[in-house]
Each structure stands twice: as C-alpha cells, then as structure tokens.
Amino acid sequence: MDASELLKRYDAGETDFQGENLCGVNLSGTDLIGADFSGCDLRGANLILTYLNRANFNRANLQGAQLCGANLSQADLLGANLQDADLHGVILYAADLRGANIALANLLDSNLISADLRNVNLSGANLRGACLRGVNMRYEKRVYNGVNLRGADLHNADLRGANLTGADLSRADLTEANLNEASLREVTLTEADLSGASLQSTFLSDLIGIAVVWKQANLRDAKLERADLSDGDFTGCDLSEANLTGANLTKIKAPQAVMRRSRFNRADLSRADLRGVDLTEAVFIEAYLGRADLRNSILKDANFAKAELSSANLQGANMQGAILPDNSTYED
C-alpha cells in the first residue's frame, strides 16, 4: 500500500491498517490519529511531524523509521521494534511501550512523561535532554524484566519521580540528570557516570553501583540502604542526611564531600578515603572502618558506638563531642 491510498482510505473513515506492508512509506506531516498499524512493516518509514495520537503500533516494525517531532501521545507501541529509529523531539506522553525494542534509537529532547517503559530495551539509546518524569520502568518478578538502559545517553534527562526499579543502567551517561524522588531500587549502575546529577530524596536501596562516578552529585536525603557503592568516586558529593545503613562503601573516594548527619549503621567503609569530609553528626553504629582514611575530617558529634575504628587513620580529625566505640565521649 502506498501513502496516497492509505490517506484516501483514512479520509474515508477507515482506521484499520493491520499487517500492511508500509516499508519506506512517506506519511510526514499527516493526521492519522487513532489509526491501527498493529503488525505493520514500517521499516524506514517517514513519519516526521505526523499526528499519531492514540494510534496502535502493537508489534509493528518501525526499525530505522523517522519520527522526529511526531505526536504519539497515548499511543500503543506494545512490543514494537523501534531499533535505530529517529525519535528526536517526539511526544510519547502516556504511551504504552511495554516490551518495545528502542535500542540505539535517538530520543533527544523527547517527551516521555508518564510513559510505560516496563521491559523495554533502551540500550545505547540517546536520551539527552529527554523528559521522563513519572515513567514506569518498574521490574516485576515473573511479569516484566527491568528495563535495559545499558550504555544509554541520559545526559541532562528529566527523570523526576520515575520508577526505574530493577533497571540496568550499567555504563549509562546520567551526567546532570534530574532523578529527584525517583525509585532506583535494585538498579544496576555499575560504571555509570552520574557527575552533577541530582538525586535528592531518591530511593536507591539494594542497588549495585560498583565503580560509579558520583562527582558533584546531589544525594541529600537519598535512601541507599544495603547499596553496593564500592570503588565509587564521590568527589564533592553532597550526601547530607543520606541513609547508607548496611551499604558497601569499601575503597570509595570522597574528597571535598559533605556527609553531615548521614547514617552509616552497619556499613562497610573499609579502606574508604574520607579525608577532609564533613561528617558532622554522622552515625556509624556498628560500622566497619578498617583502614579507613579519615585524616582532617570533621567528625563533631558523630556516633561510633560499637564501630570498628581501631585501624582507621584519624590524624588531624575534629572529633569534638564524638561518641567512641566504647560509648565514651571524645575529649580533647
């Protein structure tokens, strides 16, 4: 079917185009709201600036299609193939993309607010400047796998309040992304870059974040219980009032970091580099600080009750009012 025939039928009131071969068709700038393209072959199709609100692309093949600026709000893209598609500036508000393949696609400056991205493959996708507020990427046992965002470019992306539970963000670029109040429980962030990202009040419990770059990130009030943050770079990071209970912080580097009133109960901080860090009123109950470097750190009123501190380097640290492992108070 060519473009002219399809548009003629649509203008006559027909919306059912299921299973049609529309490979390479040019439908740019047209109005196809509510059309049913489920199962269609739309490889390489030109859908630039096309109105496709509430259209049905269930299981459609849109590999390499051009969808720049298209409006796909509330569209059904369940299981669709959008690999290597150009979705620059596309509107996917509240769209259903469950199980879709969007690997290597260009989603620069796209609008994905409230979209359902469960079990989606976004590996290698470009999501720079994309708005993903309120998206659902939640991992559900026996139903949906965590979304695949390995190596994805999410620089400056808006992910406020997004549910990324169980997602794989290994080696993803999340520099300067906004993840405030998002849910990243059980996420894999190994070797990801979150420099300058904002994660205030974000849920990050049980995540795997080995060798992550957190430079200058805002993690105030973040929930990081039982997270594996080993070998991470927290240079200049703000972790004030964060909850790191039971976290693995072995060999982290945190020069110029601020961790005031943070909780490290039962955390492993062995060989952590915390030189000069502000840990005022931080709580380290039953924490392990074997060979930790706390030289010149600020530990005023910190609580080290039952902590293992015997091999830590505390040279030059300010421990005024700190509670020591034996529950005594430090005195100059």
Where are each of the predicted segments found?
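Tandem repeat scaffolds
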Residues: 2-332
